[in-house]
């Protein structure tokens, strides 16, 4: 059995890991690289392997850094199935459709500017036709079911508690009377977060592929201090008639923000101000949430059973058309605009940043991880001048970060996950974390488990397991 790592190796984007057994290859995730345009352009077309050689894909969840390159596969001969939870199948389809539209739109915008500079045109990685081809290969599965994906090879999906439908995936391979079990954590969530159930305890395994997004840090808890911080932000917008721009994932983070704002209003801590969810994808994703209540925790289920939609209110407005989106840029505050993409690498939020970033009364609020080289990372790091659509712009808006909203397990959670596996795995591969985070987590696990073989793969590396 071989394990190869073609993405999210000492980085957090482009999750792609391949498990090879005699006569069959399984791809774990097929994510889109995000970051420097030229590098992303190359890596999203050259996947590092031959898609024709892939027998099946096992998809952990719908986020673009895990699922975003799936439509590239059928272009180059992939003809197998994509196994995915039913909620993730619905979410992934709409996210890939949105990704194709955003790529096409952004390429048109950039090409108009590049043409004037005499530079070559850029093209989308895939189009909506490619999305349709891969979506027809999705096979929805339920949590806990064991499915046979090839002779002597089975897989089961376990609730990871990260986003709706997210899963850790356990793979069993039996040969010559011996069974080897591989557990791919996917992205792990946190306990006691809104909407979703807590992550399931890990099942036993011989080999663990573990994410490390926050492998060297701990999250704040969304307690009274952070609630007061959110309350103050909304009051700031009211006082200065300003805009709060929130780049947020359309799936998971947007729905959580809606619920938390509703809680503040419902408790009488703030008066409502207009909240604009400027993302057609978020609107579609929220409908998927409503359809897949099997993923909800008890509290959210009770809210639905009381005939109260946790994702709706009179002051919450979902924006669909480009015309409505553009109108927001000419409107006066106070208002909150929640828009994707979460790392500011495309989508409507970039246009809102362009119009809001040079007003010191406005606030840009980050509520999730920002990968290296993204516009979001530059803003979080405090760059005074940032490139927006290729044009340097001076930042005067305030930058605020909420760490307590992360849907990712932190260092404590990840270490607890490893400790919960009985008996301990013989090998652990640390992925989906920037090098500093991955190496820090690896060193701590090694110190706690001296007999365990810990690896932090480089891009393109292969291991005989």
What are the residue ranges of the model-derived segments?
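Short secondary-structure boundary/capping segments
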Residues: 98-102, 106-110, 224-226, 261-264, ...
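Core dinuclear metal-dependent hydrolase active-site scaffold
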Residues: 1-52, 133-197, 323-330, 336, ...
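Cap/insert and terminal regions of metallo-dependent hydrolase folds
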Residues: 91, 168, 189-278, 363-368, ...
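Metallo-beta-lactamase
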Residues: 99-163, 293-332
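Active-site neighborhood of phospho(di)ester-bond hydrolases with catalytic His/Asp-centered motifs
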Residues: 28-30, 54-63, 70, 82-85, ...
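Hard-cation-handling environments
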Residues: 231-372, 387
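Short active-site oxyanion
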Residues: 55-56, 78-81, 243, 272-274, ...
């Amino acid at each position: 059995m071989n394990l190869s790592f073609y993405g999210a190796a000492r980085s957090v984007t482009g999750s792609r890991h391949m498990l090879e057994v005699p006569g069959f290859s399984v791809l774990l995730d097929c994510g889109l690289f995000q970051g420097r345009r030229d590098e992303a352009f190359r890596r999203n077309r050259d996947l590092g392997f031959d898609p024709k050689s892939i027998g099946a894909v096992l998809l952990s969840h719908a986020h673009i850094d895990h699922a975003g390159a799936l439509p590239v596969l059928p272009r180059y001969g992939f003809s197998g199935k994509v196994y995915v939870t039913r909620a993730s199948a619905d979410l992934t389809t709409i996210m890939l459709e949105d990704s194709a539209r955003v790529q096409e739109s952004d390429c048109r915008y950039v090409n108009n500017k590049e043409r004037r500079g005499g530079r070559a045109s850029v093209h989308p990685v895939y189009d909506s036709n490619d999305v349709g081809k891969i979506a027809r290969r999705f096979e929805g599965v339920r949590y806990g079911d064991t499915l046979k994906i090839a002779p002597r090879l089975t897989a089961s999906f376990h609730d990871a508690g990260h986003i709706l439908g997210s899963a850790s995936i356990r793979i069993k391979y039996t040969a010559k009377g011996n069974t080897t079990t591989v557990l791919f954590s996917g992205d792990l969530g946190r306990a006691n977060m809104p909407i979703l159930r807590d992550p399931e305890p890990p099942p036993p395994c011989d080999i663990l592929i573990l994410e490390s997004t926050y492998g060297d840090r701990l999250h704040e808890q969304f307690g009274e201090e952070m609630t007061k911080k959110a309350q103050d932000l909304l009051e700031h917008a009211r006082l200065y008639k300003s805009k709060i721009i929130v780049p947020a994932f359309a799936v998971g983070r947007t729905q959580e923000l809606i619920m938390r704002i509703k809680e503040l209003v419902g408790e009488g801590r703030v008066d409502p101000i207009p909240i604009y969810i400027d993302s057609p994808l978020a609107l579609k994703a929220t409908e998927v949430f409503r359809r897949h209540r099997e993923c909800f925790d008890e509290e959210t289920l009770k809210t639905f059973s009381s005939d109260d939609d946790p994702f709706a209110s009179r002051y919450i407005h979902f924006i669909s058309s480009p015309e409505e989106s553009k109108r927001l840029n000419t409107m006066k505050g106070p208002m909150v605009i929640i828009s994707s993409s979460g790392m500011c690498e495309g989508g409507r939020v970039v246009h809102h940043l362009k119009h809001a970033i040079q007003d010191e009364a406005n606030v840009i609020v980050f509520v999730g991880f920002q990968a290296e080289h993204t516009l979001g990372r530059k803003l979080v790091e405090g760059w005074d001048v940032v490139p927006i659509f290729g044009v340097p712009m001076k930042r005067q808006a305030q930058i605020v970060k909420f760490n307590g909203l992360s849907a990712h397990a932190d260092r404590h959670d990840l270490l607890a996950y490893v400790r919960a596996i009985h008996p301990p795995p013989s090998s652990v591969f640390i992925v989906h974390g920037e090098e500093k985070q991955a190496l820090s987590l690896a060193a701590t696990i090694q110190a706690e488990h001296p007999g365990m073989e810990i690896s932090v793969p480089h891009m393109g590396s292969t291991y005989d397991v």
